[in-house]
A protein has these predicted regions:
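Glycine-rich "HGGG/HGxG" loop immediately N-terminal to the catalytic nucleophile
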Residues: 91-92, 114-127
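Conserved alpha/beta-hydrolase
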Residues: 102-119
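Conserved acidic catalytic loop of the alpha/beta-hydrolase fold
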Residues: 133-151
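Conserved hydrolase catalytic core segment
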Residues: 150-188
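A catalytic-pocket lid/entrance helix-loop region that shapes and gates access to the active site
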Residues: 176-221
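Alpha/beta-hydrolase
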Residues: 205-294, 301
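Short beta-strand/loop motif that positions the catalytic acidic residue
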Residues: 299, 305-307
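Catalytic histidine-centered segment of alpha/beta-hydrolase-like enzymes
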Residues: 339-348
């Protein structure tokens, strides 16, 4: 083929595949959030004939809550994601980390009572840990009914790992396996370790401001006294600044920024994320800080832990110590060496491989013979 013929072919392909709008000189970036989210929505669109893309408001124990179900094949095993916080939703960042999951799982994201898209000032007084336990049971019942699958995988992150572990203990018959990411075991002990780590970092870095502020809340999380939220926020300020929430980053703002690009969220939803988290933390965190699963030493369901090596926000070392004592039909622990607390977005590739290679086969092992996704990718 001559050079002129090749050039003509390239030019023809260009005009065939690119619209005039894209060709316009200087028109190289989205002009608004709406345009940006439309691009992302197009990239993640599920186009398989049997595919499922559902985003709907569901009545959960009298409170309207948003649930999404996404899958290229709804026969694939269900994976319910229970977000952390309290109030730190995963749905609006799942466009980044979970698209690959949807090829092999039926992925369910749930914005918990009062969080994210489910924010409603009228239900603030109903935000209790007991109510959240009732809600997760109701959500699981709804998901089982809607998908026609009796068992599912439950992935709980951070605060969501408390709810998830509770379900695993009470209703192992509902689960193929429980997956804990940033697993909460004993919050008071985790807080103590976090304070000590932050103080040591401050000393080594010669950060006088950090040392002074951390010293101002000492002794921190000692005994059974209630931990004031103001003390918690100050401890977290320095834990996060020193990389204990996101590895080698001063905070998790990179993740928070991704919320604005979610195709599932309206502008109002994005604004409500921050209001909702403030309310959820105020209402739920005192009880979370007093919670402990350290005495739980046996589960009747396979357990997989995903832990960030540098997680100080919720002590991964404490979770590993607990896991060593735990008895379960099958258990595996996976370390994420380049992550702290936000491993889902810090190492999404390794998360995906772990889900495919280590989690997915458990659906077949627990009797889901119809599951299409249990065959690993070739």
């Amino acid at each position: 083929m001559s050079r002129s013929s090749l050039s003509g072919l390239v030019l023809l392909l260009y005009f065939l595949f690119f619209s005039p709008d894209v060709q316009a000189e200087g028109d190289v970036s989205p002009k608004s959030r709406s345009e940006a989210t439309k691009i992302i929505a197009g990239l993640r669109q599920i186009v398989t004939p049997q595919g499922v893309e559902r985003l709907e408001l569901v009545d959960i124990n009298g409170a309207k809550q948003w649930v999404s179900i996404r899958s290229r094949n709804p026969a694939n095993p269900v994976l319910l994601v229970v977000h952390g916080g309290p109030g730190w939703v995963a749905m609006p960042t799942s466009w980044y980390f979970a698209q690959g999951w949807e090829e092999y799982f039926t992925v369910v994201q749930w914005d918990q009572r009062g969080a994210g898209k489910s924010y409603d000032p009228a239900i603030v007084d109903t935000l209790t840990v007991d109510q959240m336990r009732e809600d997760i049971d109701a959500v699981i019942a709804w998901v089982r009914s809607e998908t026609g699958q009796d068992k599912l995988f439950l992935l709980g992150h951070s605060w969501g790992s408390l709810l998830g572990l509770d379900v695993a203990g009470r209703h192992p018959e509902w689960l193929h396996a429980y997956i804990g990411a940033g697993q909460v075991v004993d919050m008071r002990e985790s807080e103590r370790r976090g304070w000590a780590w932050a103080m040591q970092e401050a000393l080594e870095r010669g950060n006088a401001e950090a040392m002074k502020e951390l010293e101002s809340i000492a002794p921190y999380a000692i005994g059974e006294a209630v931990i004031p939220l103001s003390d918690l926020f100050l401890q977290r300020k320095w834990v996060n600044a020193f990389g204990g929430a996101a590895f080698n980053r001063p905070d998790a703002s990179f993740e928070a920024a991704a919320i604005a690009l979610s195709p599932d969220y309206t502008d109002e939803d994005v604004r409500n994320v921050w209001k909702a988290q403030d309310v959820s933390v105020e209402r739920l965190m005192p009880a979370v800080l007093a919670s402990s699963k350290a005495s739980l030493d046996e589960l009747d369901v396979p357990v997989i832990l995903l832990l960030g090596r540098h997680d100080i926000n919720v002590s991964s070392q404490l979770a590993a110590e607990w896991f060593a004592r735990l008895e379960a039909p099958r258990k595996r622990l996976f370390w994420f060496e380049n992550s702290a607390h936000e491993m889902l977005v810090e190492e999404p590739g390794k998360i995906f491989l772990t889900l495919i290679n280590e989690v997915l086969p458990l659906a077949r092992d627990s009797g889901n013979k119809e599951a299409v996704g249990v065959e690993r990718p070739r």
